[in-house]
């Protein structure tokens, strides 16, 4: 008899119902639960799968390069980045009639194409790529790297090349190699690329495989480096009249600290970026020599953690026991990694628009909007994942004996205080913010807008002033010419920075008022409530007063039967599931705020945001409704336009989103009855009844149906907003 899917679980493979398929898919990546798994083979499988992940990433990025080189207009775009629309790839669609062909033939192409809103054109241009040939070379190189990664994954599954468990648990070696090798050396290599290729190209000096060994990145070569006169490398930077990609106004400096933006490209100075990466490289290469391995010198992580005991004893055993807890729990490590990565991804979203690193990105409004929204949503999913794996750690890996009275144990012991404080903060934020919004709505509705409660964000304005924003008239720190902070840096980076922060053409420290104050607190409500649900889920994952033995039921369970009322919806998984809805809504508010504020800035009518953002009807009417008009007009009696694809996606996104509720609101019995009726009809329908099934059809479990509902809700939500964002921005600005 052929072995049925799933091979990793004999119990499931013998299940006579369709549960076999769905549970098989659901647990395919839960290696810990598979038959015959050992700790060592678990680590080895995960390690090998990382190479597969890398292979996919390199294949994907190779595809981006290849399609732009083949079907894009990169060379034309580099000659006039502000007026040529970058093409992502061609569209071949047999459904296209003549009006569709005409609508999508743009960007100088002779056939229908998609416009690129990913920022890759700006990135490739900034780092020194100039021709289609450069793109093809990059695509081929990444294809080779992808093949190497795939081979490495296969190789590390072979018995002779499988690392041992002790190798995976050698924390010091891993820290050293990741800090020095991964971050340090790669930052150094990137500095090298910027200095040797990107900066010369930005000054009109071609550097390629043919001449990179003979072109000096600096007129004095390595002389100043070896003689210690490093300041030479910062002398003679590009002038403010420099034209990117030409020698006009170009300097010779390679490592600078100018501050602010290149006036023409509105992006950070390339020489500042190179300097930053060099500094990062030095720091991380040093950091990667700190931990004790072969030579008996340096820090031991275990010793560091064990000695972290607060002296007075009031805080218990401190970090004792944490080394083994972290080092023996993959879920703990993954939780930490996801928490860090989530924060970093959100920071990328913030910095990509406020300090644009790529030439001419700041003038491509749709791309800026797309990149901000993309990175914020991804950050949300990653951050919720951190708490999910934190909760799984508490259920599967936490050892109370090993962590007696340390910080982890103490967190669990005073969880009621933590959860109730978070709850109070969420309630306070929610009621006060909603109260202000609704009051303002009523005042607008009754025709007395002057009776709105409008609060100036004075503390935030003070912080902006401290960073040098002069508009508010606070005479403090960098906004005061006489402060030590100002005088200390006057000749170095400050002139460029002060010019940038007080210039209204960029998004650095935007002017804020009462509308910003309100939406800031609405976002704070969302963040605190999402955190409350996630933290409660993790802290109650092992047990609660209501259900002390919760950990014995695992991470995800629907209920403990009818005998124990109130045990439904309280698994750690349920907390994660609820939190994702809050996360999505919160990031909805974040992206609405960012987008509307920027639309009004870019259009020069910032008064619209300032006046309409202080009450809810303003958001609904002047942001959502007003900006969806282009979408609703994608198809009309006069034919179609290039926004029609977004109009269709907007409708389809709503459909996917609404489908989610079908799974979220109806429970298992309804589906079971429906399936049995459909199966009955199938068996009695001629022709159809020639097709039989081996597995008895049964409804999804409660937990699975929730997952399917959540997946539809999330995908539909993001898809709908993506269509709205891109259509409403590109409809205005091209």
UniProtKB/Swiss-Prot annotation:
Protein name stated in the entry = Photosystem I P700 chlorophyll a apoprotein A2
Parts of the chain that traverse the membrane = 46-69, 135-158, 175-199, 273-291, 330-353, 369-395, 417-439, 517-535, 575-596, 643-665, 707-727
The protein's topology relative to the membrane is:
Multi-pass membrane protein
Q: Where in the cell is it found?
A: Plastid, Chloroplast thylakoid membrane
- Cofactor info, note text: P700 is a chlorophyll a/chlorophyll a' dimer, A0 is one or more chlorophyll a, A1 is one or both phylloquinones and FX is a shared 4Fe-4S iron-sulfur center.
The keyword Glycoprotein is annotated on this UniProt entry: no
Q: Which organism is it from?
A: Chlorokybus atmophyticus
List residues binding [4Fe-4S] cluster.
Answer: 559, 568
Q: Which family does it belong to?
A: Belongs to the PsaA/PsaB family.
Name the principal localization, coarsely classed: plastid
Q: Which EC numbers does the record give?
A: 1.97.1.12
Swiss-Prot/TrEMBL catalytic activity: reduced [plastocyanin] + hnu + oxidized [2Fe-2S]-[ferredoxin] = oxidized [plastocyanin] + reduced [2Fe-2S]-[ferredoxin]
Per UniProt, the enzyme's principal EC class comes to oxidoreductase
